[in-house]
Amino acid sequence: MASPLTVDERRRWLYSLKQSPALRHTRASVLLRLLERARPVEPQPGEVICREGEPVDGVYLLRSGEWRVTAGGTVLLHLRPGMSLGVEALARGTWPVAVTAESASCALFLPRAELEAVAAVPRPGGFGGGVASRADVVTFRARGLELPPATVSLLVELVAKVMVHDFGDRVLLVRAGTKRSEGAVRGADGVFRRTVTPHAPVLPEGEDFDCVLLDGVPAPEGLTPREVWLVPPGGEPDAVGTPGAQVLPTVLLSPWRPQGSRTLLGRSLPDEDGWDEDVPPPGCRLRLDWERWVVRPGDARPLAALGLDAGTRDALSRWARAITGRRVGLALSGGGVWGFYHVHLLRRLAALDVPVDLLSSASMGSLVGAYYCGTARDGREGLDGLRRLQHRARGGHLSAAALSSVVTTQAMEWLVRGDLGDLALEELPVGFLPVTTDLTTGRCVVLEKGPLALAVRASGSAPGVWAPTLQPPARYVDGAFTSMVPVDVLLHAGADLVFSSNIFPAGHHHAARPLLPGAVGLFLSALNPLARAKDLLASGVLLLHRNGDLESARGDLRYDVGTRDQPLLGSMRFTHVDEVLDEAARDMGLEQKLLELKQAWEALRTRGSTSGGRRAA
């Protein structure tokens, strides 16, 4: 049996697949799921992999061994572990070369049919499924949670309405009953409903749906459904699901009962040559007051007629996006005052009606993310928090906190807690995932639970300048040093559309002219300790920026701020916030990227224009 893909293999082959013209615009999350389902092949020495002129059968990803590539009998090159075969040939249709195994080898094979389906039909694979022409079948159950069956039925009823309203999906809701309905009946809310008796077929003949929601009905035999588990805060599911089924744990949060952890908890990202072991499946949070609802299961009124408050409506939309594979994730880099580019970005996304379901960040990006996610609750868009952060920067409060952090980073923690209160990461409806660096292990740590203000402090403790954040045995410093733009964090968390923003500029380094002419002047100039210190700073800035660029490439869309004069010195001028916001507003490159994100979101929301009649009328 083939071993799991290492982190380095996932990254390398995701990048390789993105180079294919046919797959260039395919979402990274879909390609990652294809990689997880790739079929292992083990060619023996002398075995022919493909012949010149034959139809391309798929893409091969070599894990071990060596393959010989020839054209017209001439050896062109040898493929070695980590290299791919067939990525560029997909668009051509036939193999331009012949490939033979030189030694016993192991590879992964992605069939052409699956790759073409991904490229031709922009249909999301949900939270771990694949691309399939049939409807997505979803089951619901409570795990480790005392929840009346009527409440589960009501949640299923409401999320079905939201899927129809928000996405235009054809949704079938199937419930158990004593009498079987022959076909599916469409209600005033656009949801198709059907009642089935035990052992009766679940799906009606001759009907096509985007999603089938099973409420108290077992999945048809031979079909592996997706399972939505309703779990309590801080609790783990107390049972295993259907073998092979993809699971979406949904944490039910009450707006009236804070249940956050007081201890900062995180998970280390795996090493390059390792893989994720015992990592729970990506989940989501459902923050709503279900105990006070007056809606009942079977209510076929349109969504607008139910009188749901803004918080409930927002929570159900987030849940619907998680179930159907439509979650949008943002990865925000660090960069001091340049982080207010992120503020402009978030404001524009709100104006463009692009949702944000997951947000990963480092350093200053975590401060912006905290003020956004900490106030994007109960139907609010998070813009109030961004205004408060802008006010803090303009009034000099951020500069004072940054200066105090030379002694202790508690100053930044106090500032955030004073503005946002005692919120915890696991209480936020928007999945907020700041990263930090643990110097005791050298690993990047994704902070998932604990005080929000403390997480911001740990993510932005720039080493050598600011004091570290000590959470024994961990010694946390700035997350930008191990993950400047945390795109991988979003992919692991279940984001389906990823936008990354690298706003830490690369700098222009102007070399000083030698004071003396000739070789002596050059020698003295190279010996200058002040010039060497400037070289060190410029190299550090360039290294951080380039690392951010490499991570950004694994997302679906990305923005890079480019170069600026004295970026490191300028990043500490927090009182210049209005100048940075004005510059961001004038940046047509950023605006173009945001419009592309809007277009990508609309394609994801409506499943594209090639739906083949699957959309609701």
Residue ranges and their predicted role:
Residues G307-L359, A616:
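Helix-rich "cap/lid" substructures immediately adjacent to catalytic or cofactor-binding pockets
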Residues A22, P43-A104:
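Cyclic nucleotide-binding regulatory domains
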Residues S254-L303, G307-R313, V328, R377-D419, ...:
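Non-catalytic peripheral regions of patatin-like phospholipases
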